[in-house]
A protein has these predicted regions:
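Hydrophobic protein-protein interaction segments
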Residues: 2-215
Length: 218
């Protein structure tokens, strides 16, 4: 399957080169929030799973904490109602980075303080629960050790990338081409089938990190 991966990588690099003009650098926190709103309002593929808008609350600059609490509630409702239609990946490399530093690469470091040992342990325990409930897979993809990206498929013709580098630079790419969306879906399925660890192995790794963090508290 290495040949398959190499072929996808070459194809994707070609598409990336052709879409350089669509990449925008995000340096301001407000720009990141605007992209976050765009992601939240992305319609699902092929069907509407809720009649009501699941995200009526915008993130406001004023009274941000209360606004985020309300927003978090709606996000949880959305995930609960759509858990059969959502899937996610996290890497061994990203998990190790989180345990060691208290940072997730998804959010640039200037935006928040590193999480405490207790917070990291709490998140790892929740991750164990999420793996049991949702389609979340631990994958070994060392080629992505210095960046993180979230992918939102808005519909059958649109693919939205948000790429965050280790330095905190955020780039966004939108592709409006059905064949590219389907090609990326094939690549995603390859990662799931060939590069993911079993749930049992994921639990063992997470539990070992929890034990490691607990020892640091003593």
């Amino acid at each position: 399957m290495a040949e398959t991966y190499d072929a996808y990588e070459i194809l994707f690099n070609q598409y990336l080169k052709e879409t350089k003009c669509l990449i925008t650098k995000k340096d301001d926190k407000s720009d990141v929030i605007e992209d976050f709103k765009c992601i939240l309002y992305a319609p699902p593929i092929g069907a509407v799973y809720q009649e009501d808008d699941p995200f009526p609350v915008f993130l406001e600059d004023n009274d941000f904490v209360e606004s985020f609490k309300k927003h978090s509630m709606y996000l949880k409702q959305f995930v609960k109602h759509n858990k059969d239609h959502l899937s996610g990946l996290y890497t061994l490399q990203g998990l190790r980075h989180f345990v060691d530093t208290g940072y997730t690469i998804d959010f640039p470091q200037p935006f928040y303080q590193p999480l405490t040992i207790n917070d990291r342990t709490k998140i790892l325990r929740r991750l164990n629960n999420f793996i049991n409930t949702y389609s979340i897979n631990l994958v070994d993809v060392p080629e992505y050790d210095n960046m993180s990206f979230s992918v939102i498929i808005m519909n059958m013709n649109t693919l939205y990338f948000q790429i965050v580098s280790a330095s905190g630079t955020i780039k966004t790419i939108q592709l409006h081409e059905a064949s590219l969306v389907m090609a990326f879906n094939d690549y995603y399925q390859y990662i799931l089938e060939e590069r993911s660890l079993s749930k049992e192995d994921a639990f063992k790794i997470i539990d070992s990190y929890i034990t490691q963090l607990d020892m640091l508290k003593e």
